[in-house]
Amino acid sequence: MRKLLVSFLCACIIFYQKAISPHFPPSCRYEPTCSQYAIESIKKYGPFKGAGMALLRILRCNPLCKGGYDPVP
């Protein structure tokens, strides 16, 4: 069940990367991008902890942050 949920969440993020994101100018201040960070964290830590980490990362990604290199721990 966990693997199915991980696959579903990653597929949703990849859909966003391929179908939605190209229609907007790049705005992520981090490397890897927030969507790539989300995929990596979900695969590494599972659907709940990984999605929570991704959400916190997205909340940090704003005009007031420096950004830069911030890999999944």
Curated annotation (Swiss-Prot):
Protein's name according to its UniProt entry: Putative membrane protein insertion efficiency factor
Tree of life domain: Bacteria
Cellular component terms (Gene Ontology): plasma membrane
Recorded coiled-coil stretches: none
Keyword Zinc in record: no
Annotated function: Could be involved in insertion of integral membrane proteins into the membrane.
Cross-referenced Pfam families: YidD
Topological type in the membrane: Peripheral membrane protein
Main location: membrane
InterPro entries attached to this UniProt entry: Membr_insert_effic_factor_YidD
Family membership noted in the UniProt record: Belongs to the UPF0161 family.
UniProt keyword list: Cell inner membrane, Cell membrane, Membrane
Localization of this protein: Cell inner membrane
